[in-house]
Design a protein with these regions (language model features):
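ATP/NTP phosphate-donor binding region
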Residues: 1-96
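Short glycine/serine/threonine-rich phosphate/pyrophosphate-binding segments
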Residues: 104-111, 132, 249-250
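Active-site segments that bind and position negatively charged phosphate/pyrophosphate groups
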Residues: 196, 200-310
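A glycine/threonine-rich phosphate-anchoring loop and its flanking beta-alpha core
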Residues: 7, 16, 20, 111, ...
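C-terminal charged capping/lid subdomain of soluble metabolic enzymes
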Residues: 2, 12, 181-183, 282-355
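Glycine-rich beta-strand-to-loop/alpha-helix junction loops that act as flexible
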Residues: 69-70, 100-102, 243-244
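Hydrophobic/aromatic beta-strand patches that form the interior of the parallel beta-sheet core
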Residues: 63-65, 98, 123-125, 160-163, ...
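Residue-level signal for inorganic ion chemistry
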Residues: 18, 39, 75, 126, ...
Length: 355
């Protein structure tokens, strides 16, 4: 089992990565024996997983709240229902939420924990590749509103993150590829080792080789934990974690979160951002080709031709990275490292959508 850490001071937390079943001792170490526990999960998580988790937690008062699978479930209505459940169960500040599912579950369960009684503890047990490498680490919690994705939320670190590759065996191909989109993101942000791992093991990755999966999850989390520990509230360097997200979120919002998975949308967003980087002179043509080829090598779609700038503009301009009326973009440089800038030619954005 690999143990990593993220956060600072009292909000520092452990991240455990295993290719075996969940370590029972680690889980129960962080749950007070007398505490009530609410497992928030979704309809996509196999019932056997939920049953096994409930049996693993030694507490006598363990409850389950299930939401529907999918991004649309990250709604204000579902958030209210979780709060009502906590109130009905008479939860106190010593009680705990366990987020057991994908990124949607982690976001809404974490946001519920951050706001109920001004904050109760929660544990992340992500069951999708996307949530394992991305949303479970960093303390971002949120719900969606009609005007955009993640516009209502809080930074609130979990007490513990437990990651097992065992859960990835039953993941659909669509969900698996969604997670690979975020893995690719870390390879381009600032992790040459991860980039080399993907280049040399693309076939094993598509075949879900357990050892390679553990390695790419570990490298992805190392990259993210290093960045979020330096910048817990996204006031500086953490913004580079949004590489591809400005355009990916716009695609998701435009299609009402129905057409593409989150990772698939972010993948297209990275292709668009890379093309803008090329037009702005930050990377060479062969580097743009390398980026697109690496993405395609693990079976991810790079064709964004069905999405027009004119259709996405209003969503792009609703982006959280707008400061002082200026849109900040995350681009990539010739060293394959992401950086934030508000200095770019708008025509290069339009051009990137056309090629």
């Amino acid at each position: 089992m690999v143990e990593l850490y993220a956060g600072k001071g009292p909000s520092r937390y452990k991240i455990c990565i295993t290719d075996n079943v969940l370590p029972k001792n680690q889980l129960n170490k962080y749950i007070d024996r007398k505490a009530k526990v609410l497992i928030v999960t979704d309809s996509g998580v196999p019932k056997t997983y939920i049953k096994n988790l409930k049996q693993t937690i030694r507490n006598s008062s363990v409850h389950i709240h299930e939401i529907k699978n999918g991004e649309k479930a990250k709604s204000f209505k579902n958030y209210q229902q979780i709060l009502k459940k906590l109130i009905d169960l008479k939860f106190s500040r010593t009680d705990l939420i366990v987020a057991f599912g994908g990124g949607v579950v982690g976001d809404i369960a974490g946001f519920s924990a951050s706001t109920f009684l001004r904050g109760i503890g929660y544990i992340q047990i992500p069951t999708t590749l996307l949530s394992q490498v991305d949303s479970s680490v960093g303390g971002k919690t949120a719900i969606n509103v009609p005007e955009g994705k993640n516009l209502v939320g809080a930074f609130y670190n979990p007490k513990l993150v437990l990651i097992s590759t065992v859960y990835l065996k039953t993941l659909s191909e669509k969900e698996y590829k969604s997670g690979l989109g975020e893995v690719i993101k870390y390879a381009f942000i600032d992790n040459k080792k991860l980039r080399n791992l993907i280049e040399k093991n693309s076939q094993k990755i598509t075949q879900r080789d357990n050892k390679i999966l553990k390695d790419i999850i570990e490298e992805s989390i190392k990259t993210k934990s290093k960045i979020v520990t330096k910048d817990e509230k996204e006031s500086g360097i953490r913004a580079i974690l949004n590489f591809g997200h400005t355009f990916g979120h716009a695609i998701e919002a435009r299609t009402r979160y129905k057409k593409l998975s989150h990772g698939a949308a972010i993948t297209l967003g990275m292709v668009i951002a890379s093309k803008i980087s090329f037009f702005e002179g930050h990377i060479k043509d062969y580097q743009l080709e390398n980026i697109i080829n690496l993405i395609a090598s693990i079976g991810l779609d790079t064709d964004h031709s069905s999405y027009k700038y004119s259709e996405l503009k209003k969503y792009i301009m609703n982006d959280k990275k707008i400061a002082d009326g200026k849109l900040n973009l995350i681009m990539i440089n010739e060293n394959y490292k992401a950086f934030k800038t508000d200095k770019f030619d708008l025509n290069n954005i339009k051009k990137a959508f056309k090629v």
